[in-house]
A protein has these predicted regions:
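Extracytoplasmic gate region of multi-pass secondary transporters
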Residues: 43-44, 242-268, 296-346, 350, ...
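Extracellular/periplasmic helix-loop-helix junction of adjacent transmembrane segments
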Residues: 46-75
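Helix-breaking motifs and short loop linkers at transmembrane-helix boundaries and internal kinks
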Residues: 55, 88, 109-115, 143, ...
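Central cavity-lining transmembrane alpha-helices of secondary-active solute carriers
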Residues: 64-81, 340-353
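Conserved MFS/SLC helix-loop-helix module at the cytosolic interface between two early adjacent transmembrane helices
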Residues: 75-114
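Cytoplasmic helix-loop-helix junction between adjacent transmembrane helices
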Residues: 119-158
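Helix-loop-helix hairpin linking two adjacent transmembrane segments in secondary transporters
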Residues: 154, 158-201, 232-270
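C-terminal transmembrane helical hairpin of 12-TM major facilitator-type secondary transporters
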Residues: 369-426
């Protein structure tokens, strides 16, 4: 019997579920995750009209796509995940979907850059509750030997959402304006929210874990009950250290707003609010933090994923504008072109990463980070080759045709786009095995906090800032060179994930 302070929700399902229902739930979660990325990534395809409307530099647009979203998305994920470990995960996801979709629609009525910045923060508030609870649900619907593939299937929402946001958002913006694009995709999520709530049930926590079925750990002390000693001293250090992180993020946010010319009184208010959210979030997570943050594998996996996300989010957010500047494509053409790359390459890469890792993981747990480590080593040169393929085609006898150059570039871009997402299934599955079942949502949220604060916030801004920095030397081609410089993050990610492959076996929790 569990204590009331951390009891599972009363509606939790105790009876076994059928395979068909399990896959139905996975399909619904994939669709919700797709909407998550539609609303998150639509801003990339709308870069040109938004920059024109509000007269933004690349650096300012990078702040809009990065820190405006990531600052609240990353930090609020922890208290919402903590709540999901103690209450209905489905209710939390339903509310989150409604909030982020509503704020996406509000972006369509923004009358100034400051309003758009705040509405993008609202999108981040909602999306903070949409991922970690889903990871926990999947872990409780699928047994350990199927989790990497299930996580990979869930991650299909990323290329589906990126492609959908690019195609739908771009075409709507080209024909009806960018405001219509925001409103249309936002209202779609509001309509889907009731379906999620009414058809998806919370499964028994830890019910698919053989070890969990044999033992019932005390809810108040799940770590020690699973043979994992707690360390209250470390927990306090994690909580106190949160305020150092909060201070740094508050300073960064304040400087960002100051650089955008936002009224001075808003700067300390925003900074103080962000300080409080991050501090309270990590104080809430200190018990889980005392379990997973002592593990070297957690840091290597988290920082490795974050390094790759600097490129992943950055390239995904800026490639549409790159195609318009360097490939001379229109907004409608880019919508179809990049949507195809994101969809085909992304689906293949995610499924390949999960399938290969599950197969190799039966022999060695180190395969889970090793598969994406190898993938990233291949990604960097392939991106550079794809970006230069029109120039290479031009060296052919007769100079080649523009159509041939675009086709060749499309085919080459599929390779790094797929490999870029190969980490999602293996790494997220591995993180689920670094903590016992009652801590999985919070463990996932801490992982996502690191990944998104370093990856999403830094990545989107980095490429815009570097593009502005290089513009005096390279003009309209500055974005190309900015993306080149970012490829080093893939190499860093490979090194970190290679390290995780050597430590994961020791830290693994069945």
């Amino acid at each position: 019997m569990t204590t009331s302070g951390a009891a599972a929700p009363q509606e939790a399902v105790e009876k076994p579920v059928s395979a068909s229902y399990r896959y139905y739930v996975l399909a619904i979660l994939v669709f919700v995750y797709m909407l998550n990325f539609v609303d998150r990534q639509i801003i990339g395809i709308l870069a040109a009209p938004l920059k024109q409307e509000f007269q933004l530099s690349d650096s300012q647009f990078g702040l809009l796509g990065g820190i405006a979203f990531a600052s609240v998305y990353s930090t609020l994920a922890i208290p919402l995940a903590w709540l999901a470990d103690r209450s209905s995960r489905v209710w939390i996801m339903t509310g989150a979907l409604t909030v982020w979709s509503g704020f996406t629609a509000l972006c369509g009525v923004a009358g100034s850059f400051g309003q758009l910045f705040l509405f993008r923060m609202g999108v981040g508030v909602g999306e903070a509750g949409g991922v970690a609870p889903a990871y926990s649900l999947i872990a409780d619907y699928f047994p350990p030997n199927q989790r990497a593939r299930a996580m990979a299937a869930f991650a299909f929402g990323i290329p589906l959402g990126t492609a959908g946001g690019t195609l739908i958002g771009g075409l709507l913006a080209a024909h009806y304006g960018w405001r219509t694009a925001f409103i249309a995709v936002g209202l779609l999520g509001v309509l889907v929210a009731p379906i999620l709530r009414l058809t998806v049930r919370d499964p028994k926590r830890g019910g698919t874990d053989a070890a969990a079925a044999k033992s019932a750990p005390a809810a108040e002390h799940p770590a020690s009950a699973r043979g994992m000693p707690t360390d209250d001293g470390l927990g306090r250090k994690v909580g106190l250290g949160a305020f150092g992180v909060a201070g740094g993020m508050a300073l960064l946010a304040g400087l960002s707003l100051a650089g955008m010319g936002v009224a001075n009184p808003l700067i300390p208010a925003f900074g103080a609010g962000l300080f409080a959210v991050i501090g309270v979030s990590l104080l809430i997570a200190r018990r889980t933090g005392s379990v997973i943050m002592r593990k070297k594998s957690f840091w290597l996996l988290s920082l490795g994923a974050a390094a790759s996300s600097v490129c992943g989010y950055g390239v995904a957010g800026w490639l549409p504008l790159f195609f318009m500047r360097s490939f001379d494509l229109t907004l409608s053409q880019v919508s179809w072109y990049y949507a195809g790359i994101a969809l085909i390459g992304g689906l293949f890469g995610i499924w390949m990463g999960g399938s290969v890792a599950d197969k190799l993981g039966r022999r060695s747990k180190g395969a889970y980070p090793l598969v994406p480590a190898v993938a990233f080593l291949i990604s960097a040169p392939c991106f550079i080759l794809a970006m230069n393929s029109p120039w290479l085609i031009g060296l052919l006898p007769g100079g080649g045709s523009r159509a041939l150059a675009l086709i060749v570039a499309f085919l080459i871009f599929l390779i790094p786009t797929g490999l870029n997402l190969a980490w999602l299934g293996p790494v997220t599955a591995a993180v689920q095995h670094l903590a016992p079942a009652p801590m999985r949502s919070t463990a996932s949220a801490i992982f996502l906090l690191i990944n998104n604060l370093l990856g999403l916030a830094v990545g989107f801004f980095y490429f815009g800032w570097m593009s502005d920095l290089l513009r005096p030397a390279f003009g309209e081609e500055s974005l190309r060179w900015a993306i080149y410089t970012g490829m080093g993050f893939y190499l860093l990610s490979s090194v970190l994930l290679f390290g995780a492959s050597r430590t994961l076996k020791k830290d693994w929790v069945d």
